[in-house]
């Protein structure tokens, strides 16, 4: 990761931000400035508090409440100083299968995650898969992102959502258990479905990245490791359901 297009970012909760970024960039190059990067994270640390505080019992309402999501995060970092390479990052989150929702799948919401209702019940349903950039989930992610951008200056970084194209998206469309069977019974159809699930990735990524870069934000998501350039975390959670040669071949 070469240090290019570097700009100054002042964060009141992280006075050592610039040096922390230099350590991260050095680590990617296999080098050390003064020590390796160190960070401290408790994933979903404030979820229980958020659940108790929300006035409605409708989980979808809570996930979709942009003001509440941003305010909850801000309260969670009040009075804190971020040490080492632990960065204060808010990233808009509608669940790991939201990528499938961009094509028409409906999401159901739980306390800490969401999941897709299978959209491709029959192989003929593949013809229905079209990216909709005006989709309810894309519009909501934009709203949450903009809400955070309005309040982040000097306080925290704003990132982009957890994107799972490819195999994970195909599994969300088809149902993970069914896709396991499909890999045995219809491997060519599976391959074609995965191709559809990844072909629009750059368009989707660029949509969110452009919005962040317009506001001089870095590229960062759930992992909490920022980049001044373009950064994405490749994901294939579905691989945990597969073993042997099929797993190695399709991953």
Residue locations for each model-derived region?
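Active-site loop segments of alpha/beta catalytic cores
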Residues: 1-48, 52-54, 76, 83-92, ...
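N-terminal glycine-rich cofactor-binding segment that shapes the pocket for flavin-like pterin cofactors
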Residues: 58-71, 78, 90-133, 140
């Amino acid at each position: 990761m070469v240090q290019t297009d570097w700009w100054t970012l002042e964060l009141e909760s992280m006075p050592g931000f610039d040096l922390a970024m230099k350590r991260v960039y050095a680590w990617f190059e296999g080098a050390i400035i003064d020590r390796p990067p160190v960070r401290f994270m408790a994933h979903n640390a404030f979820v229980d508090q958020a659940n108790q505080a929300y006035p409605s019992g409708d989980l979808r309402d809570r996930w979709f409440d942009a003001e509440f999501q941003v305010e909850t995060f801000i309260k969670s970092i009040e009075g804190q100083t971020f040490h080492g390479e632990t960065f204060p990052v808010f990233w808009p989150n509608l669940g790991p299968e939201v990528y499938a929702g961009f094509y028409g799948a409906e999401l159901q919401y739980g306390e800490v995650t969401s999941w897709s209702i299978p959209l491709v019940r029959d192989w003929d349903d593949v013809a229905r898969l079209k990216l909709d950039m005006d989709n309810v989930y894309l519009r909501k992610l934009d709203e949450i992102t903009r809400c955070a951008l309005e309040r982040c200056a000097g306080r925290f970084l704003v990132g982009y959502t957890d994107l799972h194209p490819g195999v994970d998206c195909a599994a969300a469309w088809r149902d993970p258990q069914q896709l396991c069977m499909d890999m045995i019974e219809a491997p060519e159809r599976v391959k074609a479905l995965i191709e559809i699930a990844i072909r629009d990735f750059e368009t989707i990524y660029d949509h969110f990245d452009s919005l962040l870069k317009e506001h001089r934000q870095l590229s960062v998501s759930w992992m909490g490791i920022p980049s001044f350039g373009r950064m994405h975390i490749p994901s294939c959670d579905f691989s945990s359901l597969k073993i042997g040669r099929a797993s190695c071949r399709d991953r």
